[in-house]
């Protein structure tokens, strides 16, 4: 199989299938898909500078859900992401996955309220 054909097949994967592929590749080859963090040898930042620069975009992470409200959470994931039923169910059951990435603080807070109202536990991570 050529690399072009392989790339074409990977492009057809769903979000859940792609995440599973990455996990399996990390395990098999002992690598991490996380981008390496560059360490700068610059002097310390002025005190309070980090607090003043609040993150502007966030990832909405589904950490868990009330099992009695699983269907409600899946419906909300489908509404927010546009995923099909099977993909939304897989994302919800996997846990710890991003439902939406790179959203503004106001939208992230709104999504968090919606998900918590549906019985889900949400974490907002700066992106």
From Swiss-Prot:
GO terms for molecular function: mRNA binding; structural constituent of ribosome. GO terms for cellular component: cytosolic large ribosomal subunit. Coiled coil: none annotated. Pfam families: Ribosomal_L12 (PF00542), Ribosomal_L12_N (PF16320). One of its GO terms (biological process) is translation. Keywords: Ribonucleoprotein, Ribosomal protein. The keyword Protease does not apply. Transmembrane segments: none annotated. Belongs to the bacterial ribosomal protein bL12 family. Homodimer. Part of the ribosomal stalk of the 50S ribosomal subunit. Forms a multimeric L10(L12)X complex, where L10 forms an elongated spine to which 2 to 4 L12 dimers bind in a sequential fashion. Binds GTP-bound translation factors. Forms part of the ribosomal stalk which helps the ribosome interact with GTP-bound translation factors. Is thus essential for accurate translation. This is Large ribosomal subunit protein bL12.
């Amino acid at each position: 199989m050529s690399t072009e054909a392989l790339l074409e097949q990977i492009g057809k994967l769903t979000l859940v299938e792609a995440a599973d592929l990455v996990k399996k590749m990390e395990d098999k080859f002992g690598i991490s898909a996380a981008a390496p963090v560059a360490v700068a040898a610059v002097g310390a930042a002025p005190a309070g500078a980090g607090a003043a620069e609040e993150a502007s975009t966030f990832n909405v992470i589904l950490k868990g859900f009330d099992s009695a409200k699983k269907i409600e959470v899946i419906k909300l994931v489908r509404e927010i992401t546009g995923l099909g039923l099977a993909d939304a169910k897989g994302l919800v059951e996997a846990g710890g996955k991003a439902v939406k990435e790179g959203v503004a603080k106001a939208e992230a807070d709104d999504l968090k309220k919606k998900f918590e109202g549906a019985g889900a536990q949400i974490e907002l991570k700066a992106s």
